[in-house]
Amino acid sequence: FRRAVSRAGLNPYLYQHANIREQVSWAHVHDRAAATEKASRIVDAAVAKAASLRPLDKVRVAAVHRTLVVGGGPAGLRAALDLARWGMEVVLVERSGGLGGHALRLGSTYPTDEPGRALVERLVAAVAVERLIDVRLSTDVTDVTGYVGDFRATLRSQGGAEREEEIGAIILATGFRDYEPAPGEYGFGDPRVLTLPAFQERLYAAPKGADLASVAGVDGPVRSVAFLHCVGSRQVEGLDRTNGRLNAYCSRVCCTATVRAAAETRRRFPDVRVVDVYRDIRTYARDQEAAYRAAAESGVLFVRVPSDERARVETAPPRDSYPLLVRTRDVLTFGAELELPVDLIVLATGMVPGGADELVAATKAPTGSDGFLLEVHPKLRPVESAIPGVLLAGTARGPMDITESTTTASAAAAKVATLLARDQVEMEPFVARVDPSLCSATGACLEACPYAGAIAMKDVEIDDGVVVKRAYVNPVACKGCGACVAVCPNGAIDVNGWEIGQYLAMVDAITGEESAPGSAAKEEVAAR
Protein backbone atom coordinates (compact mmCIF):
# COMPACT_ATOMS: atom_id res chain seq x y z
CA PHE A 1 0.00 0.00 0.00
CA ARG A 2 2.81 2.41 0.85
CA ARG A 3 4.50 1.70 -2.48
CA ALA A 4 1.25 2.56 -4.25
CA VAL A 5 1.06 5.84 -2.33
CA SER A 6 4.69 6.56 -3.23
CA ARG A 7 4.07 5.89 -6.93
CA ALA A 8 1.27 8.44 -6.78
CA GLY A 9 3.81 11.06 -5.71
CA LEU A 10 3.01 11.20 -1.99
CA ASN A 11 5.20 10.45 0.99
CA PRO A 12 4.57 6.72 1.65
CA TYR A 13 3.93 7.39 5.33
CA LEU A 14 0.93 9.61 4.59
CA TYR A 15 -1.12 6.43 4.62
CA GLN A 16 -3.36 4.86 7.24
CA HIS A 17 -4.89 1.41 6.99
CA ALA A 18 -8.47 0.76 8.08
CA ASN A 19 -8.58 -2.97 8.70
CA ILE A 20 -12.22 -3.92 8.25
CA ARG A 21 -11.55 -7.41 6.96
CA GLU A 22 -10.03 -9.12 10.04
CA GLN A 23 -11.59 -6.74 12.55
CA VAL A 24 -15.09 -6.66 11.06
CA SER A 25 -16.12 -8.88 8.16
CA TRP A 26 -14.38 -12.01 9.45
CA ALA A 27 -15.23 -11.37 13.09
CA HIS A 28 -18.93 -10.46 12.79
CA VAL A 29 -20.33 -12.63 10.02
CA HIS A 30 -23.72 -13.03 11.68
CA ASP A 31 -24.44 -9.43 12.66
CA ARG A 32 -24.49 -7.26 9.55
CA ALA A 33 -25.86 -4.14 11.19
CA ALA A 34 -23.36 -4.05 14.05
CA ALA A 35 -20.54 -5.00 11.67
CA THR A 36 -21.39 -2.12 9.37
CA GLU A 37 -21.50 0.30 12.30
CA LYS A 38 -18.13 -0.94 13.54
CA ALA A 39 -16.61 -0.68 10.05
CA SER A 40 -17.83 2.89 9.73
CA ARG A 41 -16.28 3.87 13.04
CA ILE A 42 -12.98 2.19 12.14
CA VAL A 43 -12.93 4.16 8.90
CA ASP A 44 -13.77 7.35 10.83
CA ALA A 45 -10.83 6.68 13.14
CA ALA A 46 -8.48 6.04 10.22
CA VAL A 47 -9.57 9.28 8.55
CA ALA A 48 -9.03 11.20 11.80
CA LYS A 49 -5.52 9.86 12.14
CA ALA A 50 -4.67 10.33 8.45
CA ALA A 51 -5.61 14.00 8.75
CA SER A 52 -2.78 14.52 11.25
CA LEU A 53 -0.08 12.37 9.65
CA ARG A 54 3.25 14.00 8.83
CA PRO A 55 5.69 13.06 6.04
CA LEU A 56 8.43 10.79 7.38
CA ASP A 57 11.75 9.60 6.01
CA LYS A 58 13.33 6.22 6.58
CA VAL A 59 16.17 5.98 9.06
CA ARG A 60 19.43 5.22 7.26
CA VAL A 61 22.69 3.92 8.70
CA ALA A 62 25.99 2.97 7.09
CA ALA A 63 26.32 -0.82 6.81
CA VAL A 64 29.25 -2.96 7.89
CA HIS A 65 29.46 -5.74 5.30
CA ARG A 66 30.38 -8.46 7.76
CA THR A 67 28.19 -11.03 9.50
CA LEU A 68 28.54 -12.87 12.80
CA VAL A 69 27.25 -16.45 12.72
CA VAL A 70 26.94 -17.98 16.18
CA GLY A 71 26.98 -21.77 16.21
CA GLY A 72 29.06 -24.27 14.27
CA GLY A 73 26.45 -26.96 13.64
CA PRO A 74 24.93 -27.74 10.22
CA ALA A 75 22.81 -24.55 10.27
CA GLY A 76 25.72 -22.27 11.17
CA LEU A 77 28.01 -23.90 8.61
CA ARG A 78 25.39 -23.62 5.87
CA ALA A 79 24.67 -19.95 6.64
CA ALA A 80 28.38 -19.08 6.69
CA LEU A 81 29.01 -20.85 3.38
CA ASP A 82 26.07 -19.18 1.64
CA LEU A 83 27.17 -15.73 2.77
CA ALA A 84 30.80 -16.31 1.78
CA ARG A 85 29.79 -17.53 -1.67
CA TRP A 86 27.87 -14.28 -2.10
CA GLY A 87 31.08 -12.38 -1.34
CA MET A 88 30.38 -11.41 2.27
CA GLU A 89 32.82 -11.70 5.17
CA VAL A 90 31.74 -14.00 8.00
CA VAL A 91 32.92 -14.52 11.56
CA LEU A 92 31.83 -18.03 12.58
CA VAL A 93 31.87 -18.55 16.35
CA GLU A 94 31.60 -21.95 18.03
CA ARG A 95 31.81 -22.38 21.80
CA SER A 96 33.13 -25.96 21.62
CA GLY A 97 36.48 -27.05 20.25
CA GLY A 98 35.16 -28.33 16.92
CA LEU A 99 32.56 -27.80 14.22
CA GLY A 100 29.62 -30.06 13.47
CA GLY A 101 27.39 -30.03 16.54
CA HIS A 102 25.03 -32.90 17.35
CA ALA A 103 25.04 -34.11 13.74
CA LEU A 104 28.48 -35.66 14.20
CA ARG A 105 27.06 -38.45 16.33
CA LEU A 106 24.24 -39.38 13.95
CA GLY A 107 24.97 -42.77 12.47
CA SER A 108 22.34 -42.37 9.78
CA THR A 109 20.30 -39.47 8.44
CA TYR A 110 16.92 -39.71 6.76
CA PRO A 111 16.11 -40.33 3.93
CA THR A 112 19.56 -40.95 2.35
CA ASP A 113 21.00 -43.02 5.24
CA GLU A 114 24.16 -40.96 4.94
CA PRO A 115 26.11 -40.84 8.22
CA GLY A 116 25.78 -37.51 9.97
CA ARG A 117 29.56 -37.25 10.25
CA ALA A 118 29.97 -37.51 6.46
CA LEU A 119 27.40 -34.79 5.90
CA VAL A 120 29.06 -32.47 8.39
CA GLU A 121 32.58 -33.17 7.16
CA ARG A 122 31.60 -31.97 3.68
CA LEU A 123 30.38 -28.68 5.13
CA VAL A 124 33.44 -28.31 7.37
CA ALA A 125 35.79 -28.97 4.45
CA ALA A 126 34.04 -26.31 2.38
CA VAL A 127 34.27 -23.81 5.25
CA ALA A 128 37.97 -24.56 5.77
CA VAL A 129 38.91 -23.46 2.24
CA GLU A 130 36.64 -20.41 2.16
CA ARG A 131 38.87 -17.37 2.66
CA LEU A 132 35.97 -15.08 3.65
CA ILE A 133 35.06 -17.20 6.70
CA ASP A 134 36.96 -16.54 9.93
CA VAL A 135 36.34 -19.51 12.26
CA ARG A 136 36.68 -18.96 16.03
CA LEU A 137 36.52 -22.16 18.05
CA SER A 138 36.24 -22.38 21.85
CA THR A 139 34.80 -18.86 21.81
CA ASP A 140 31.71 -17.27 23.36
CA VAL A 141 29.86 -14.08 22.47
CA THR A 142 29.68 -12.19 25.77
CA ASP A 143 28.20 -8.85 24.72
CA VAL A 144 26.49 -7.22 21.76
CA THR A 145 25.87 -3.50 21.36
CA GLY A 146 24.79 -1.32 18.48
CA TYR A 147 22.12 -1.83 15.88
CA VAL A 148 21.45 -3.32 12.48
CA GLY A 149 24.25 -2.46 10.09
CA ASP A 150 26.64 -1.50 12.89
CA PHE A 151 26.84 -3.99 15.77
CA ARG A 152 29.78 -4.44 18.14
CA ALA A 153 30.21 -8.00 19.41
CA THR A 154 32.62 -8.96 22.17
CA LEU A 155 34.12 -12.41 21.68
CA ARG A 156 35.89 -14.20 24.52
CA SER A 157 38.04 -17.28 24.04
CA GLN A 158 38.25 -20.00 26.66
CA GLY A 159 41.68 -18.63 27.53
CA GLY A 160 40.02 -15.38 28.60
CA ALA A 161 41.22 -13.17 25.74
CA GLU A 162 38.55 -10.75 24.48
CA ARG A 163 38.19 -9.17 21.07
CA GLU A 164 35.60 -6.78 19.68
CA GLU A 165 34.26 -7.29 16.17
CA GLU A 166 32.37 -4.82 13.98
CA ILE A 167 29.52 -6.56 12.18
CA GLY A 168 26.43 -5.62 10.24
CA ALA A 169 24.15 -8.53 11.11
CA ILE A 170 23.98 -11.58 13.37
CA ILE A 171 22.70 -15.08 12.64
CA LEU A 172 21.92 -17.10 15.76
CA ALA A 173 22.36 -20.80 15.02
CA THR A 174 22.91 -21.83 18.62
CA GLY A 175 21.29 -25.23 18.27
CA PHE A 176 19.68 -27.37 20.96
CA ARG A 177 20.45 -29.68 23.86
CA ASP A 178 19.09 -33.16 24.39
CA TYR A 179 16.53 -33.41 27.15
CA GLU A 180 17.99 -35.23 30.14
CA PRO A 181 15.33 -37.07 32.11
CA ALA A 182 15.03 -36.46 35.83
CA PRO A 183 16.33 -39.27 38.04
CA GLY A 184 13.67 -41.96 38.12
CA GLU A 185 11.74 -40.54 35.15
CA TYR A 186 10.72 -43.68 33.24
CA GLY A 187 13.39 -45.52 35.19
CA PHE A 188 16.20 -43.18 34.15
CA GLY A 189 19.27 -43.75 36.26
CA ASP A 190 19.05 -47.52 35.93
CA PRO A 191 21.97 -48.69 33.71
CA ARG A 192 19.44 -50.54 31.54
CA VAL A 193 17.57 -47.33 30.72
CA LEU A 194 19.24 -45.29 27.97
CA THR A 195 18.27 -42.15 26.09
CA LEU A 196 17.72 -42.48 22.35
CA PRO A 197 20.74 -40.30 21.39
CA ALA A 198 23.03 -42.44 23.57
CA PHE A 199 21.59 -45.66 22.16
CA GLN A 200 21.81 -44.46 18.54
CA GLU A 201 25.43 -43.45 18.94
CA ARG A 202 26.33 -46.88 20.28
CA LEU A 203 24.15 -48.78 17.80
CA TYR A 204 25.51 -47.19 14.62
CA ALA A 205 29.11 -47.30 15.86
CA ALA A 206 28.94 -50.98 16.84
CA PRO A 207 31.03 -53.44 14.82
CA LYS A 208 29.33 -56.21 12.89
CA GLY A 209 28.76 -59.30 14.97
CA ALA A 210 28.50 -57.48 18.31
CA ASP A 211 25.63 -58.57 20.54
CA LEU A 212 23.06 -56.05 21.75
CA ALA A 213 24.16 -56.29 25.38
CA SER A 214 27.70 -55.14 24.52
CA VAL A 215 26.32 -52.44 22.22
CA ALA A 216 24.09 -51.08 25.00
CA GLY A 217 26.78 -51.54 27.62
CA VAL A 218 24.66 -53.65 29.97
CA ASP A 219 25.27 -56.91 31.79
CA GLY A 220 23.38 -60.03 30.85
CA PRO A 221 21.51 -60.88 27.67
CA VAL A 222 19.21 -58.44 25.91
CA ARG A 223 16.20 -60.38 24.63
CA SER A 224 13.61 -57.60 24.64
CA VAL A 225 13.81 -53.82 24.13
CA ALA A 226 11.14 -51.18 24.69
CA PHE A 227 11.29 -47.76 23.03
CA LEU A 228 9.26 -45.10 24.90
CA HIS A 229 8.18 -41.99 22.98
CA CYS A 230 7.73 -38.36 24.08
CA VAL A 231 10.15 -38.24 27.01
CA GLY A 232 10.68 -34.55 27.70
CA SER A 233 8.18 -33.47 25.04
CA ARG A 234 4.40 -33.01 24.96
CA GLN A 235 4.43 -32.96 28.74
CA VAL A 236 1.18 -32.41 30.62
CA GLU A 237 1.12 -30.96 34.11
CA GLY A 238 0.06 -33.57 36.62
CA LEU A 239 0.83 -36.48 34.30
CA ASP A 240 4.52 -36.13 33.48
CA ARG A 241 7.57 -35.84 35.65
CA THR A 242 9.79 -32.98 34.49
CA ASN A 243 13.40 -32.00 34.80
CA GLY A 244 12.67 -28.48 36.02
CA ARG A 245 10.54 -27.27 33.10
CA LEU A 246 7.27 -28.40 31.56
CA ASN A 247 7.89 -28.91 27.83
CA ALA A 248 4.46 -28.89 26.19
CA TYR A 249 5.79 -28.77 22.62
CA CYS A 250 6.44 -31.69 20.27
CA SER A 251 10.10 -32.18 19.37
CA ARG A 252 9.05 -33.37 15.90
CA VAL A 253 12.09 -35.45 14.95
CA CYS A 254 11.97 -38.03 17.77
CA CYS A 255 9.27 -40.25 16.28
CA THR A 256 11.09 -40.80 13.00
CA ALA A 257 14.39 -41.31 14.82
CA THR A 258 12.77 -43.79 17.20
CA VAL A 259 11.01 -45.97 14.62
CA ARG A 260 14.18 -46.02 12.51
CA ALA A 261 16.28 -47.05 15.52
CA ALA A 262 13.71 -49.73 16.37
CA ALA A 263 13.78 -51.07 12.80
CA GLU A 264 17.59 -51.02 12.77
CA THR A 265 17.64 -52.95 16.04
CA ARG A 266 15.38 -55.60 14.51
CA ARG A 267 17.53 -55.75 11.37
CA ARG A 268 20.77 -56.24 13.27
CA PHE A 269 19.38 -58.42 16.03
CA PRO A 270 16.46 -60.38 14.55
CA ASP A 271 16.10 -62.55 17.66
CA VAL A 272 15.43 -59.54 19.90
CA ARG A 273 11.82 -58.56 20.57
CA VAL A 274 11.33 -54.81 19.99
CA VAL A 275 8.29 -52.97 21.37
CA ASP A 276 7.47 -49.36 20.49
CA VAL A 277 5.37 -47.69 23.23
CA TYR A 278 3.80 -44.43 22.08
CA ARG A 279 0.92 -41.99 22.51
CA ASP A 280 1.03 -40.69 18.94
CA ILE A 281 3.54 -41.33 16.17
CA ARG A 282 4.36 -38.21 14.20
CA THR A 283 6.58 -39.15 11.28
CA TYR A 284 5.53 -35.84 9.83
CA ALA A 285 7.68 -34.98 6.80
CA ARG A 286 7.37 -36.12 3.22
CA ASP A 287 8.12 -39.83 2.79
CA GLN A 288 8.81 -40.33 6.52
CA GLU A 289 5.71 -42.49 6.88
CA ALA A 290 7.83 -45.07 5.07
CA ALA A 291 10.04 -45.27 8.16
CA TYR A 292 7.02 -46.29 10.25
CA ARG A 293 5.94 -48.90 7.71
CA ALA A 294 9.48 -50.29 7.53
CA ALA A 295 9.56 -50.66 11.32
CA ALA A 296 6.22 -52.46 11.34
CA GLU A 297 7.29 -54.78 8.52
CA SER A 298 10.54 -55.58 10.34
CA GLY A 299 8.57 -57.00 13.25
CA VAL A 300 8.50 -54.07 15.68
CA LEU A 301 5.44 -54.38 17.95
CA PHE A 302 3.49 -51.17 18.56
CA VAL A 303 1.65 -50.39 21.80
CA ARG A 304 -0.42 -47.21 22.02
CA VAL A 305 -0.80 -45.60 25.44
CA PRO A 306 -4.04 -43.62 26.12
CA SER A 307 -3.39 -39.89 25.79
CA ASP A 308 -4.44 -39.20 29.38
CA GLU A 309 -2.19 -41.89 30.84
CA ARG A 310 1.52 -42.68 30.94
CA ALA A 311 3.43 -45.93 30.74
CA ARG A 312 5.11 -46.95 34.01
CA VAL A 313 8.59 -48.42 34.29
CA GLU A 314 9.20 -50.70 37.26
CA THR A 315 11.95 -52.97 38.49
CA ALA A 316 10.83 -56.57 38.11
CA PRO A 317 10.63 -58.84 41.16
CA PRO A 318 13.88 -60.73 41.84
CA ARG A 319 12.41 -64.06 40.68
CA ASP A 320 11.61 -62.69 37.18
CA SER A 321 13.99 -63.48 34.36
CA TYR A 322 13.63 -59.93 32.97
CA PRO A 323 14.97 -57.03 35.06
CA LEU A 324 12.43 -54.36 34.01
CA LEU A 325 8.69 -54.11 33.46
CA VAL A 326 6.73 -51.61 31.39
CA ARG A 327 3.09 -51.40 32.49
CA THR A 328 0.46 -49.67 30.38
CA ARG A 329 -2.96 -49.97 28.79
CA ASP A 330 -3.02 -50.45 25.02
CA VAL A 331 -5.53 -48.54 22.89
CA LEU A 332 -4.87 -50.89 19.95
CA THR A 333 -6.18 -53.86 21.95
CA PHE A 334 -9.20 -51.98 23.32
CA GLY A 335 -7.61 -50.91 26.59
CA ALA A 336 -6.02 -54.21 27.57
CA GLU A 337 -3.69 -54.02 30.57
CA LEU A 338 -0.19 -54.98 29.44
CA GLU A 339 2.87 -55.94 31.41
CA LEU A 340 5.92 -55.93 29.13
CA PRO A 341 9.03 -57.64 30.51
CA VAL A 342 12.17 -56.12 28.97
CA ASP A 343 15.95 -56.17 29.35
CA LEU A 344 16.53 -52.67 27.96
CA ILE A 345 14.53 -49.44 27.71
CA VAL A 346 15.32 -46.62 25.28
CA LEU A 347 13.79 -43.21 26.05
CA ALA A 348 13.02 -41.04 23.01
CA THR A 349 14.12 -37.74 24.51
CA GLY A 350 13.26 -34.46 22.85
CA MET A 351 15.05 -31.21 22.15
CA VAL A 352 15.39 -28.32 24.60
CA PRO A 353 16.83 -24.82 23.97
CA GLY A 354 20.57 -24.66 23.41
CA GLY A 355 21.54 -22.90 26.61
CA ALA A 356 22.71 -19.62 25.08
CA ASP A 357 21.07 -17.46 27.76
CA GLU A 358 23.95 -14.98 27.96
CA LEU A 359 23.92 -14.46 24.20
CA VAL A 360 20.13 -14.10 24.12
CA ALA A 361 20.34 -11.47 26.85
CA ALA A 362 23.08 -9.62 24.98
CA THR A 363 21.17 -9.49 21.68
CA LYS A 364 17.77 -9.01 23.38
CA ALA A 365 16.33 -11.54 20.94
CA PRO A 366 12.98 -12.65 22.41
CA THR A 367 12.18 -16.24 23.26
CA GLY A 368 8.85 -18.03 23.20
CA SER A 369 7.10 -19.81 26.03
CA ASP A 370 9.05 -22.94 25.07
CA GLY A 371 12.38 -21.19 25.59
CA PHE A 372 13.42 -21.30 21.93
CA LEU A 373 14.17 -18.10 20.03
CA LEU A 374 11.02 -16.48 18.69
CA GLU A 375 10.57 -15.50 15.06
CA VAL A 376 8.51 -12.45 14.06
CA HIS A 377 5.99 -14.55 12.11
CA PRO A 378 6.21 -18.30 11.43
CA LYS A 379 4.99 -17.92 7.84
CA LEU A 380 5.78 -14.39 6.69
CA ARG A 381 9.07 -13.74 8.53
CA PRO A 382 10.22 -17.13 9.79
CA VAL A 383 13.94 -16.39 10.22
CA GLU A 384 13.76 -12.83 11.59
CA SER A 385 13.76 -11.93 15.26
CA ALA A 386 12.08 -8.82 16.62
CA ILE A 387 15.53 -7.18 16.75
CA PRO A 388 16.44 -5.77 13.31
CA GLY A 389 19.59 -7.39 11.99
CA VAL A 390 19.36 -10.45 14.27
CA LEU A 391 18.36 -13.56 12.28
CA LEU A 392 17.55 -17.10 13.43
CA ALA A 393 18.62 -20.41 11.91
CA GLY A 394 18.20 -24.08 12.65
CA THR A 395 17.09 -25.53 15.96
CA ALA A 396 17.75 -22.26 17.77
CA ARG A 397 14.15 -21.41 16.86
CA GLY A 398 12.63 -24.80 17.59
CA PRO A 399 12.93 -28.54 16.99
CA MET A 400 13.60 -29.54 13.37
CA ASP A 401 15.64 -32.02 11.35
CA ILE A 402 18.89 -31.35 9.47
CA THR A 403 17.15 -30.62 6.18
CA GLU A 404 14.95 -27.99 7.79
CA SER A 405 17.89 -26.59 9.76
CA THR A 406 20.02 -26.01 6.69
CA THR A 407 17.04 -24.62 4.76
CA THR A 408 16.34 -22.02 7.45
CA ALA A 409 20.06 -21.22 7.53
CA SER A 410 20.05 -20.49 3.80
CA ALA A 411 16.95 -18.34 4.27
CA ALA A 412 18.65 -16.36 7.05
CA ALA A 413 21.77 -15.92 4.92
CA ALA A 414 19.66 -14.67 2.00
CA LYS A 415 17.96 -12.17 4.30
CA VAL A 416 21.32 -10.88 5.53
CA ALA A 417 22.66 -10.62 1.99
CA THR A 418 19.65 -8.53 1.00
CA LEU A 419 19.92 -6.40 4.13
CA LEU A 420 23.62 -5.60 3.67
CA ALA A 421 23.67 -5.48 -0.13
CA ARG A 422 23.90 -1.68 -0.16
CA ASP A 423 26.13 0.77 1.63
CA GLN A 424 23.24 1.84 3.84
CA VAL A 425 20.61 -0.06 5.79
CA GLU A 426 17.14 1.47 5.71
CA MET A 427 14.76 1.15 8.66
CA GLU A 428 11.21 2.24 9.32
CA PRO A 429 10.88 5.74 10.82
CA PHE A 430 8.47 4.76 13.61
CA VAL A 431 10.82 5.81 16.39
CA ALA A 432 10.54 8.14 19.36
CA ARG A 433 11.34 11.85 19.09
CA VAL A 434 11.76 14.48 21.80
CA ASP A 435 10.41 18.03 21.87
CA PRO A 436 13.30 19.88 23.58
CA SER A 437 11.02 22.77 24.54
CA LEU A 438 8.98 20.43 26.78
CA CYS A 439 11.80 18.22 28.09
CA SER A 440 13.00 18.92 31.65
CA ALA A 441 15.59 16.11 31.79
CA THR A 442 13.89 14.08 34.52
CA GLY A 443 15.57 10.91 33.24
CA ALA A 444 12.37 8.87 33.48
CA CYS A 445 12.67 7.93 29.82
CA LEU A 446 16.19 6.57 30.29
CA GLU A 447 15.04 4.31 33.10
CA ALA A 448 12.06 3.02 31.12
CA CYS A 449 13.89 2.38 27.84
CA PRO A 450 14.71 -1.35 27.40
CA TYR A 451 17.22 -0.76 24.58
CA ALA A 452 20.82 0.24 25.26
CA GLY A 453 21.82 3.49 23.60
CA ALA A 454 18.35 4.41 22.36
CA ILE A 455 17.99 7.46 24.66
CA ALA A 456 20.70 9.62 26.19
CA MET A 457 21.00 13.00 27.85
CA LYS A 458 22.81 15.65 25.86
CA ASP A 459 23.95 19.19 26.60
CA VAL A 460 21.86 21.69 24.66
CA GLU A 461 22.50 25.43 24.48
CA ILE A 462 19.40 27.58 24.92
CA ASP A 463 18.87 31.34 25.22
CA ASP A 464 21.75 33.50 26.44
CA GLY A 465 24.24 30.65 26.08
CA VAL A 466 22.79 28.63 28.94
CA VAL A 467 23.57 24.89 28.60
CA VAL A 468 20.94 22.43 29.83
CA LYS A 469 20.37 18.70 29.66
CA ARG A 470 17.82 17.38 27.23
CA ALA A 471 16.83 13.85 26.22
CA TYR A 472 18.00 12.73 22.80
CA VAL A 473 16.74 9.69 20.87
CA ASN A 474 19.11 7.71 18.67
CA PRO A 475 16.72 6.79 15.83
CA VAL A 476 18.85 3.83 14.80
CA ALA A 477 18.83 2.17 18.23
CA CYS A 478 15.21 3.06 19.05
CA LYS A 479 12.62 0.34 18.35
CA GLY A 480 9.55 2.56 18.74
CA CYS A 481 8.13 0.59 21.68
CA GLY A 482 6.75 3.74 23.33
CA ALA A 483 7.89 2.94 26.88
CA CYS A 484 9.43 6.40 27.16
CA VAL A 485 6.22 8.07 26.00
CA ALA A 486 4.27 6.47 28.83
CA VAL A 487 6.58 7.71 31.61
CA CYS A 488 7.43 11.24 30.47
CA PRO A 489 5.75 13.62 32.96
CA ASN A 490 5.81 16.53 30.50
CA GLY A 491 4.52 14.78 27.38
CA ALA A 492 7.78 15.70 25.65
CA ILE A 493 8.13 12.41 23.74
CA ASP A 494 6.07 10.99 20.92
CA VAL A 495 6.51 8.11 18.48
CA ASN A 496 6.53 9.01 14.80
CA GLY A 497 3.40 7.72 13.13
CA TRP A 498 1.68 7.04 16.45
CA GLU A 499 1.56 10.33 18.28
CA ILE A 500 -0.62 10.91 21.33
CA GLY A 501 -2.63 13.50 19.44
CA GLN A 502 -3.33 10.96 16.72
CA TYR A 503 -4.53 8.40 19.25
CA LEU A 504 -6.85 10.97 20.80
CA ALA A 505 -8.23 11.92 17.39
CA MET A 506 -8.98 8.27 16.67
CA VAL A 507 -10.69 7.79 20.03
CA ASP A 508 -12.80 10.90 19.47
CA ALA A 509 -13.81 9.64 16.04
CA ILE A 510 -14.82 6.23 17.39
CA THR A 511 -16.75 7.46 20.41
CA GLY A 512 -18.20 10.67 19.01
CA GLU A 513 -21.86 11.03 18.07
CA GLU A 514 -20.80 12.63 14.80
CA SER A 515 -20.19 9.16 13.35
CA ALA A 516 -23.10 9.75 10.98
CA PRO A 517 -21.88 7.51 8.14
CA GLY A 518 -22.01 4.48 10.41
CA SER A 519 -25.44 5.35 11.77
CA ALA A 520 -26.86 5.83 8.30
CA ALA A 521 -25.39 2.56 7.09
CA LYS A 522 -26.79 0.72 10.11
CA GLU A 523 -30.27 2.06 9.40
CA GLU A 524 -29.98 1.06 5.73
CA VAL A 525 -28.93 -2.51 6.56
CA ALA A 526 -31.67 -2.87 9.18
CA ALA A 527 -34.27 -1.78 6.65
CA ARG A 528 -33.34 -4.53 4.15
What name fits each language-model region?
Residues 1-528:
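Residues forming the flavin
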